[in-house]
């Protein structure tokens, strides 16, 4: 909710109201507290730290489609399961493709996300994907505010080398 509020404040638009009802067995249901008929609905939801966030997003998408939203745009700052982007050994799932299929089946019209583990994940979707990079936000600050002669940028794996290369 915090990020959604910051985005709305920055854009000067109101944050829509939702209700999430929790049940004793751990299930939950979502509903919109206002009409979204004919509206473009942006759903801001990370898939981290657990799968409940993903399920909540899927239910929000479904509810928006059933409420006759004009379009449903999923804004996922952290796309979980993205490291599962290929079959690197026998008998493994491709989690990123499965999540893409689930989001598409639920009814998203577009995805906005940041710093995917691998660019190929964009191809898993049958809707437009806006893949944003945090490095574009931070590079100017790093270049102008930090002593570059002693700066080292590290990455947790090879797939993220493009980020550290961008600082050169």
Locate predicted features.
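Conserved small/polar residues in nucleotide/adenosyl-binding loops
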Residues: 162-168
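Active-site loop-to-helix "anion-binding N-cap" substructures in soluble metabolic enzymes
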Residues: 1-2, 6-158
